């Protein structure tokens, strides 16, 4: 009798845990969701790296220009998932960013499919793409840092900060960041 109760209790806990994780994943915007379903905030990512910096890697998939001029986590290696092509979109007049055809091969050059990799971009969208590309290539422990380096934009017309990226993200979380460049961490095409 006690054994049946224990089995039911364990099953109930597992089902509840799965339901909570599923709900958390679906509350994310589609653009930040990944096939692996592994998500961290910038704060959680820094803690995870800090606890096990020998085994946890932080990968910044923004363009080299963003990495250099906006700042970056001091331990983050830059391998862009998308690169600028020097054109502007007709509709919104924004830079056109094309998929970096060497992204997966460059990651494979330095990391194994079994490594724990925490991926950040500006605000979580490109990092989701990077996670999915790496998952397709056989990587299994790749996390999307859902608020990225700069964080999400404030959406409050009454706020002075409306449209500004001051809400969350690595830079706003209190985690270390820098403009200092380390050649071994910079993108080398």
Model-based region annotation:
Residues 2, 20-54, 68-116, 127-189:
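Rhodanese-like catalytic fold shared by cysteine-dependent sulfurtransferases
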Residues 124:
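Conserved G/P- and acidic residue-centered "switch" motifs that form tight phosphate/ATP-binding loops
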Residues 1-10:
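Bacterial N-terminal signal peptides that target proteins for export
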Residues 14, 35, 57:
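Short, flexible active-site loop motifs that bind/organize anionic cofactors or intermediates
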Residues 9-20:
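Bacterial N-terminal signal peptides
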